[in-house]
């Protein structure tokens, strides 16, 4: 009888210990929301997977509020000159430099082989897009002309370059080709710190290179 009681006690203790170590996955990471003069957007963490690279890419970084403010200042100062050809902005399509306040942004940080910080900025003008959607993942699009565009800014050289404006046509939100964003796991013991399951970055020939 004592042996049976001891066996039951050991089993219960083992089950309790296992339950304490159980990690319960919860909601996805959300990008950090940022506001400034004439801009509103979301900064994505350096471990967030993306479907593209930049030239001479060597790594990733998370754009800070200060870096985003600097990026926006450079873009807003120079976009009028960079966009002087008004490519894909004919007819009913908006001239992008005349409507900068209308776009919500997504910011992704890259480093190149010289250690420069390059911020890729995605501009989206779609009143049907919720802020929740914009914070949940990076959105690549096709169509929509001047309502959707992206550009890069090298903070070391202060160069703004690589403007790409969507072609005309119905807007399409392109499916993601990579894994979901990193997820936060929370232990049932609320006194423990949250654990982050990092997915890392996959580089393959199929990744799109924005020049």
Model-derived regions, located:
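Generic short amphipathic/hydrophobic targeting helices enriched at N-termini
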Residues: 6-8, 192, 198
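Compositionally biased non-globular segments, especially hydrophobic aliphatic-rich helices
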Residues: 10-17, 184, 199-202
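Surface-exposed acidic loop/strand-edge motifs in secreted or periplasmic proteins
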Residues: 22-133
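Extracytoplasmic electrostatic interaction patches
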Residues: 117-184, 188, 195-197, 201
